[in-house]
Every structure is written in C-alpha cells, then in structure tokens.
UniProtKB/Swiss-Prot annotation:
This is Deoxyribonuclease-2-alpha. InterPro entries: DNase_II. PANTHER family: DEOXYRIBONUCLEASE II, DEOXYRIBONUCLEASE-2-ALPHA. It comes from Bos taurus. Hydrolyzes DNA under acidic conditions with a preference for double-stranded DNA. Plays a major role in the clearance of nucleic acids generated through apoptosis, hence preventing autoinflammation. Necessary for proper fetal development and for definitive erythropoiesis in fetal liver and bone marrow, where it degrades nuclear DNA expelled from erythroid precursor cells. Glycans are attached at N215, N269, N293. It catalyses: Endonucleolytic cleavage to nucleoside 3'-phosphates and 3'-phosphooligonucleotide end-products. It holds the Pfam family DNase_II.
Length: 365
C-alpha cells in the first residue's frame, strides 16, 4: 500500500523534463491559465485550509471551477508550473523573479522607487512562461528548493495569470519590463540567455527606460497562437494606468478591481469619454458564490462591461502609483471569465474615499 501511495504521489507531481510551460489544474500543459485565490473568510472546513482555496480558469474553460487542492500545493496549476524553478537540475533554465514586496531576507531593499509590479519569467532554449500576479513575498527564491505560499498572503484575495510563450516573445516581454522597472530579487541569466535578451540583462541590473514615451503597448502571441496585449508604464508617465491610458487604448469603460485599503485611493473617474469605475464587490456565479468586498481583495484586474476585454496585472488605482511603473496583460478570451464577477462598483458621484493605514492591511500595496 505504501508503495502504491508513493507511485500515485510521484505521478501527481511529475512534470515532463524539457517541457517548460504553464501547467493546468489537470496536470497537463496549457497555453494559459488564471487563478483567483479567494479571501480567507470564503473558505470552509479546516482552519488551516482557510485562505488557500482558489478558482481556476484556462483556455478550455467555459466557467470558473474550484481549484484542485490548495494554492500552497504543487498539485495545483501555480505550484506545478513553478516546480522546475526548485529542482536541482535548473541550471539549464533562465529565470527572473521580481516583486516590489519580495520574500524576506537579510538583504533589505527600498522598493518605493521601483515599479509596483510582481511576476516570474521562466524559460529555456525553446520558450517558457510569464506569470503575472498580485502576491506579496512570492514566490520563494530558487535556492529555497521548495515551492511554498507565504502565510501573509492567505487572508486576502489574489490573482495570478500564467501564459506560455515561444522564446522569441521574451524579447518584447523583457523590453516591457524596462518600463515597469521591477525589483528583481532572484535571477539566473547566463551565457546565451544574456546575449539573446539584452533588455532582460538591463532589467536584472536595475536599469530602466531613459526617455519618453513613458508607456509601451505590445501584442504578444502565446505558444498556441492566442493574442495578448501588454500595457506597461514607467513612473514618469505620471498618471493612472486605467483612467490615464488603458480605457482610451481599449476604447471602452472599465470596471477595475484593486487593493482599496491604502491611502490616496483614486475615486471612479467619469471625466473622459471612457469612464473608469472602482469595483466594490466581487461575486462568483452560482448560489455558493462566493462573494466578497474589495477591501478583502488584493487582486488587480479590470474588465470592459460590454466586452470584449479583460486584463490581469499588478497595479492599483492610487495617487502614489501614478508615479510608479507597472502594467497589465489584456486578452479578449478572458472577458467571459471576469465579466460575471463584478457585483457592485462605485458611481462617479462619490468624490473621495480614505482608508487608514492600519496594520497589517495598510502595509500591503
């Protein structure tokens, strides 16, 4: 029995060697997926599992499904996709881990001048994936040799989007990062990788775009041909990502979900031809929901109410982030996932709001 159990566990955690791609909850490679980690209060059962449940959506989905297991497990999409990072044979890979709130270490870095941006690039000579997320202190450094989920990220909602790309697309992706100006806390970029991706080498060194325009939009094509639009801005752009650029670029009103327990929150904006509304409550379809308020949700996403766009990124709507780098990744096939989630939003009549910087919520960005 013990032998059979060991074999089953090995099969569950098996990732084919040389196949560097996003992996879905099914355990099979997928072109892309989105994971929505639910706030802690929406869980049930064992208290240790509360705050680790998630919803899942990928290229094959018609609706959100419950995640397999928990977000801190390598049986699920996020953990399984990141497994190659923590293997002993990862010397053949290139990776860049960035986060304005990196995992704790003895080396303290001031991230206030860097972009408000979080993500992972993981690639080999054939291609790899870009994981964009909202999770502080995540993922662990490669030297930890184990995947884990930060305990401090269990309480609030989080979003993660993973897209598999051919190697050539990382040229454009790395250039986008010169605008978002990420704080890189772990990387390996050696030999051919450094030569092939000079922009990525500049990013690792802490360099950024030096002249305007201070924003950049590029079309990216996944391994299976899905089209994504990447929007990136540097701090000198000096405006809100959503009302100052994205709504006009997409030609549509936006409903934006972001972290609303910080100072300087920007109210809904109806001053332009395209309006931008702050989402105040999110609800998953069905009688079981769940539903939760924006003050319980650290995720960053937006949707055009009448279609056809939805975006997942790493930027909030607040005054400080008008002057910081960051961005979002948009796609039309994401619209059917996010449109049903908006339950309530703030009308433009409300001029201002203020949330205290209480601990621990106010320490998050």
């Amino acid at each position: 029995m013990a032998t059979l159990s060991s074999l089953l566990l090995t099969a569950l955690l098996w990732v084919p060697v040389g196949t560097l791609t996003c992996y879905g909850d099914s355990g099979q490679p997928v072109d892309w997926f989105v994971v929505y980690k639910l706030p802690a209060h929406t869980g049930s059962g064992d208290a240790t599992q509360n705050g680790l449940r998630y919803k899942y959506f990928d290229e094959h989905s018609e609706d959100w499904s419950d995640g397999v297991g928990f977000i801190n497990s390598t049986t699920g999409a996020v953990g399984r996709s990141l497994l190659p990072l923590y293997r002993n044979n990862n010397s053949q890979l290139a990776f860049v881990l960035y986060n304005d709130q990196p995992p704790k270490s003895s080396e303290s870095k001031d991230s206030s001048s860097r972009g408000h941006t979080k993500g992972v690039l993981l690639l080999d000579q054939e291609g790899g994936f870009w994981l964009i997320h909202s999770v502080p202190n995540f993922p662990p450094r490669a030297s930890s040799a184990v995947y884990s989920w930060p305990p401090g990220a269990q309480k609030y909602g989080q979003t993660l989007i993973c897209v598999s790309f051919p190697l050539t697309q990382f040229l454009d992706i790395s250039k986008q990062l010169t605008y978002t100006y990420p704080l890189v806390y772990d990387h390996r970029l050696e030999g051919d990788f450094a030569q092939k991706f000079p922009y990525l080498e500049e990013v690792v060194k802490g360099h950024h775009v030096r002249q305007g325009p201070w924003n950049s939009s590029v079309t990216l094509t996944s391994k299976k041909g899905a089209t994504f639009q990447s929007f990136a801005k540097f701090g000198n752009f000096g405006d809100d990502l959503y009302s100052g650029w994205l709504s006009e670029a997409l030609g549509s009103t936006l409903q934006v979900q972001f972290w609303q327990r910080s100072s300087g929150i920007l109210p809904s904006n109806c001053s332009g031809a395209q309006h931008v509304f702050d989402v105040t409550q999110t609800a998953f379809p069905g009688p079981a929901g769940p539903a939760f308020n924006a003050t319980e949700d650290h995720s960053k996403w937006c949707v055009t109410p009448k279609g056809p766009w939805a975006c997942v990124g790493d930027m909030n709507r607040n005054q400080r982030e008008e002057h910081r780098g960051g961005g979002t990744l948009c796609a039309q096939m994401l619209w059917k996932a996010f449109k049903p989630l908006v339950k309530a939003w703030e009308p433009c009549e409300k001029k201002s709001r203020a949330y205290s910087l209480g601990s621990p919520a106010g320490l998050w960005t």
